[in-house]
């Protein structure tokens, strides 16, 4: 019986390997022979996820962005640049073109990262607060909760640093200049509430703090409790999801 199971398992494994191989052939043909940008994107994702060949994936995304201006590939390429996996040049400026293409195609995170590039100045490029605000607003309009939250903190007058890398890890970048917006607590509250409605717990906590302290808005302890409770509820849900992530029943 065990021999039969082993034989069946081996056959299934062989069939899966053949399927994966055929998918790769199909994507290569679509990309290189038929010159279809969407096939190149799929090929890049195939090399990234199934072959774990990140160098090849980056090259495919870059070419598809440079030659075809394909938004998804441009976003992928931009994120690889942010993660420091594209050569030795750490210049954020090179992210502007690919992220602009992604943003123009309504990829929310593309707008958010494009905004953050403009928010963070470099030695040879000053921060552009106007563009940073514009693109962060666009990301928020596209229902990117993180963008709404960041925008709300900017309107508090804080100089937030670019802290998120491609892996979602905190990383403080040493930049000579950061953008700044005039303090506007009405706008800060507006975008903080919007981010809270998109389940960003730290934004709910910010709203609670504003109402509790009367920071730029009328003091309202009932509203403070409401948003504090909402922050706790979201955090409990996130913890529960993390706990159950590996449960298959």
Curated annotation (Swiss-Prot):
One Pfam family matching this protein: Sel1
UniProt KW keywords: Repeat
Sel1-like repeats, residue ranges: 37-69, 71-107, 108-144, 201-236
Gene3D superfamilies: Tetratricopeptide repeat domain
SMART domains tied to this protein: SEL1
Gene Ontology cellular-component terms listed: mitochondrial intermembrane space
InterPro entries attached to this UniProt entry: HcpB-like, Sel1-like, TPR-like_helical_dom_sf
Family note: Belongs to the hcp beta-lactamase family.
Entry protein name: Cytochrome c oxidase assembly factor 7 homolog
Organism: Caenorhabditis elegans
């Amino acid at each position: 019986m065990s021999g039969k199971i082993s034989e069946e398992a081996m056959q299934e494994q062989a069939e899966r390997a053949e399927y994966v191989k055929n998918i790769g052939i199909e994507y290569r043909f679509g990309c290189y022979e038929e010159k279809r940008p969407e096939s190149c994107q799929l090929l890049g994702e195939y090399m990234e996820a199934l072959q774990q060949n990140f160098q090849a994936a980056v090259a495919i995304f870059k070419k598809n962005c440079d030659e075809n201006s394909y938004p998804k590939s441009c976003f992928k390429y931009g994120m690889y640049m942010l993660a420091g996996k594209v050569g030795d040049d750490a210049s954020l400026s090179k992210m502007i073109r690919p992220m602009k293409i992604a943003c123009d195609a309504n990829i929310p995170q593309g707008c958010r990262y494009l905004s953050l590039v403009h928010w963070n100045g470099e030695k040879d490029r000053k921060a552009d607060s106007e563009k940073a605000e514009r693109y962060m607003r666009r990301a928020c309009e596209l229902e990117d909760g993180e963008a709404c939250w960041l925008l709300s903190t900017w309107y508090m007058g804080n100089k937030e640093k670019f802290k998120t890398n491609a892996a979602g890890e905190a990383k403080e970048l040493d930049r000579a200049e950061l953008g700044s917006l005039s303090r506007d607590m009405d706008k800060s509250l507006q975008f903080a509430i919007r981010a809270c409605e998109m389940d960003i717990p730290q934004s709910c906590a910010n709203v609670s703090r504003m109402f509790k302290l009367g920071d730029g808005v009328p003091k309202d302890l009932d509203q403070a409790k409401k948003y504090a409770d909402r922050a706790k509820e979201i955090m409990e849900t996130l913890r529960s999801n993390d706990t159950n992530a590996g449960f298959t029943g």
